[in-house]
Regions:
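N-terminal secretory signal peptides
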Residues: 1-24
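A bilobed periplasmic-binding-protein/Venus flytrap-type ligand-binding module shared by bacterial periplasmic
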Residues: 158-163, 201, 271-283, 294, ...
């Protein structure tokens, strides 16, 4: 891979056409291979390898429960979960591959643009799990079979119900500019979080930078991770969050905490977290088995129930009490544009918010 120290834009210079819109419509290789079912031969080969390494930006408790479910289903294969933020996952793999270290088998990132880089660099392995071929929408799978949407979620507005009455809560991003919210808003940073970078791109595209200029005058609390605004909200340090993980709000609310999600009338930013296998996988059969498991109905139901995430697998059931995904207006994801404009967005945001 390229030097992981150079900019996101530099790493993808000239490759913006690799991804069109929200769809994973990369066209730089052959067509996707035929879908592969889980067979006794694959299971036997995977058990001979005995392990699989999963690099992920998924919340650690969710990743660990996924790993335990796989180990329970396929005894004798240990899953090593390496969990960190999406940017650090990307950097680590870049550093390892630059040193000819092939330690990762399967990867997940909350920054879909990472998969553009890995695919362009020719280090992802084409592999299509049977469930992906049968059930996943076209726009949620790479046409060359190198990755697919393992999880989706939203970056949303939310509020602390102990500090804000429901009829006074913001209903839109425009509402956050009301002077009554000055000093009461928390927001994450696109320079740190892949989720917030994606959300910031969609918001500046749909709302314009003028909205951010007005928000910057609201004396917001600036935090780093997309998981931080829900935490500040829960603690009562701020009354409203302008962005952050929907799934954290679900988890907190269902645990009895005083938080409530809001789906902005302008649309909520859509975040996509794909999974892929590396060509240099040291455990290729275990990698295929784990990848197939991740996209199965059972695993997808697990990330919904345990992780508060969304799934495009049509056989899953949404958890009662959560607003159905089909009823939510969302903004359009565009990973290629995020990669192309990411550095400029970070620079402009940092200058605007002075942090």
């Amino acid at each position: 891979m390229k030097n992981p120290g150079i900019s996101r834009r530099g790493m993808l210079k000239g490759s913006g056409a690799l991804l069109a819109g929200a769809a994973f419509s990369t066209r730089v290789m052959a067509d996707a291979p035929p879908p592969e079912p889980i067979t006794p031969a694959l299971i036997e080969a995977a058990k001979k390898e005995g392990k699989v390494s999963y690099y992920t930006s998924t919340d650690l408790p969710v990743a660990e429960k996924l790993a335990k479910a796989f180990e329970a289903k396929y005894s004798g294969i240990a899953v090593r979960v390496e969990r960190t933020g999406a940017g650090r996952v990307f950097q680590r793999i870049g550093q390892e591959y630059a040193s000819n270290i092939h330690a990762v088998d399967v990867v997940n990132s909350s920054d879909a643009a990472h998969f553009i880089v890995w695919k362009r660099d020719g280090i992802l392995a084409p592999y299509v799990p049977e469930d992906v071929a049968k059930f996943y929408p076209t726009e949620h799978k790479d046409v060359d079979g190198q990755f697919a949407s393992w999880r989706i979620w939203l970056s949303i507005i939310a509020y602390n119900t102990s500090l804000v009455k429901a009829d006074e809560a913001p209903k839109s991003f425009a509402d956050l500019l009301d002077p009554k919210w000055k000093g009461k808003i928390v927001k994450a940073h696109p320079g740190y979080s892949g989720t917030i970078m994606t959300a910031t791109y969609q918001m500046q595209r749909d709302l314009g930078w003028a909205w951010f200029e007005q928000l910057a005058k609201q004396n917001i609390m600036q935090v780093q991770s997309s998981a931080d605004p829900p935490k500040k909200l829960d603690l009562g340090e701020r009354a409203v969050m302008a962005d952050g993980n929907e799934y954290n709000i679900f988890q907190m609310k269902e645990a009895g905490r005083p938080v409530e999600p809001v789906y902005a009338s302008e649309g909520s930013p859509l975040i996509i977290g794909p999974n892929g296998i590396f060509k240099g996988s040291p455990n290729p059969n275990a990698a295929k088995l784990f990848q197939s498991f991740c996209f199965s109905r059972d695993a997808q139901q697990l990330i919904i129930d345990v992780g508060g995430l969304r799934s495009v697998h049509p056989q899953t059931q949404e958890k009662p009490g959560r607003t159905p995904f089909k009823d939510i207006k969302t903004m359009k994801d565009d990973a290629a544009a995020v990669e192309k404009e990411g550095d400029a967005i970070k620079a402009r945001y940092t200058k605007l918010f002075r942090v």
